[in-house]
Design a protein with these regions (language model features):
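Amphipathic alpha-helical interface segments
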Residues: 127-137
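Amphipathic alpha-helical segments within well-ordered protein domains
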Residues: 6-10
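Mid-protein regulatory/catalytic core that forms ligand/cofactor-binding pockets
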Residues: 11-129
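Conserved segment of winged-helix/HTH DNA-binding domains
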Residues: 1-4
Length: 137
């Protein structure tokens, strides 16, 4: 389940051998990003490359709304969002996942309204949450 990937990864990272880690990466097709759009830590120690460019060209939804950005692609959900399974479920139900095209609108109450292209309904997020969701223009 998408909402529990972060918790499981945190458990496994402390008990998995390097050999098992390499095999899992191979079985998964050598991914470089988590399902939340963040680089998988430690890949450079397994022969992969470090993903330092994941911050390039992205801005939080809070900053995007304040700067007048009205659309963008959801790129990543940072750790404060990943540790809340209920929030992750709500975001996934609304289509707020990496790769989704979003319309962004600031709300007067400090919330950010997000509508995913092709979805009937959007979701309003408080700035405390929206600041941990990143988009690329």
């Amino acid at each position: 389940d998408w909402a529990f990937v972060h918790d499981e990864a945190c458990r496994w990272e402390h008990v998995m051998s390097e050999q098992v880690e390499r095999r899992i990466l191979e079985l998964l097709g050598d991914p470089t990003e988590s399902p939340y759009g963040n680089p998988i830590p430690g890949l450079e120690h397994l022969g992969g490359s470090a993903a330092n460019a994941f911050l390039d060209g992205v801005i939080s939804l809070t900053h995007a709304a304040a700067a007048g950005v009205r659309s963008g692609t959801i790129r990543r959900l940072s750790e404060p969002v990943q540790v809340d399974p209920d929030l992750l479920h709500q975001l996934r139900e609304a289509g707020v996942v990496p790769g989704a095209e979003a319309r962004i609108r600031p709300e007067p109450n400090g919330y950010v309204s997000i509508e995913i292209v092709g979805r009937a309904e959007g979701i309003d997020l408080p700035s405390e949450i929206a600041q941990h969701i990143y988009v690329a223009e």
